[in-house]
């Protein structure tokens, strides 16, 4: 299943109105608009594309009248109305983990999730799942969460493996001159001084992608184990 995430109602309009048969679902994001206008545009999009795709919508305004970022916990009443009047299949709810919040503000609100679940059932998408503890992740479906976003975890937790590989293969990736320079500057130690020549197998995008993909598969497997094992 291929999902088109954070498709902006205006900037991505051409894409949103194109042939999306290769996608299973799309997040139609009109959250920069006031609530009523958001619902109007989302409802119209559901009417045009709702028979072709599973559509995910965002019921919260992310900016106030002054253009300031808002990060309020989603209200169950508003969420129920949004789903009823737009016809979306899944609603993105801010449950304290939204990426717009600063790090010290991230705190998953299972109570808010369950209040929404009581109104719309298990049709909630959680963004910012990377900041949720493993114990909480195990219980997400009970809270009404049917879809999660974990891209930050995929990027963050796969990065160390790529960094380690690059450091250990500095000469093969960048050549012996760069390796020697980094040793002189103190960024690498003498044990890194292999003197190897750079090689195509190490400085291609494919080589780095293979490392990242391998690590990402492990991360996804970890999430699946939390839910199903």
Locate the predicted segments by residue.
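Structural detector of well-ordered beta-strand residues that form the stable sheet scaffold
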Residues: 3-5, 55-56, 125-127
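Alpha/beta enzyme core
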Residues: 8-119, 134-143, 150, 218-221, ...
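Active-site proximal loops enriched in glycine and acidic residues that flank catalytic Cys/His/Asp
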Residues: 95, 128-130, 152-154
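Active-site clefts of carbohydrate-active enzymes
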Residues: 121-123
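C-terminal alpha-helical cap/extension of soluble enzyme domains
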Residues: 138-229
């Amino acid at each position: 299943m291929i999902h088109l995430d954070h498709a902006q109602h205006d900037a991505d309009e051409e894409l949103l109105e194109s042939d999306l048969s290769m996608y299973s679902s799309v997040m139609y994001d009109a959250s920069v608009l006031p609530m009523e206008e958001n619902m109007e545009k989302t409802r119209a999009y559901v009417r045009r594309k709702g028979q072709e795709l599973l559509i995910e919508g965002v019921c919260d305004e992310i900016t106030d009248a002054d253009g300031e970022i808002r990060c309020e916990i989603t209200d169950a009443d508003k969420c129920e109305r949004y789903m009823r009047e737009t016809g979306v299949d899944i609603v993105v709810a801010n449950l304290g983990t939204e990426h717009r919040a600063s790090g010290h503000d991230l705190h998953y609100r299972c109570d808010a999730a369950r209040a929404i679940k009581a109104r719309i059932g298990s049709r909630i998408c959680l963004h910012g799942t990377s900041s949720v503890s493993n114990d909480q992740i195990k219980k997400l479906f009970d809270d009404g969460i049917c879809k999660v976003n974990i891209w930050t975890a995929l990027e963050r937790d796969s990065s160390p493996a790529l960094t380690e590989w690059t450091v250990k293969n500095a000469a093969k990736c960048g050549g012996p001159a760069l390796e020697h320079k980094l040793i002189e500057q103190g960024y690498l130690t003498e044990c890194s001084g292999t003197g190897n020549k750079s090689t195509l197998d190490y400085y291609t995008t494919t080589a780095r992608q293979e490392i990242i993909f391998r690590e990402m598969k492990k991360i996804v497997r970890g999430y699946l184990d939390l839910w199903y094992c």
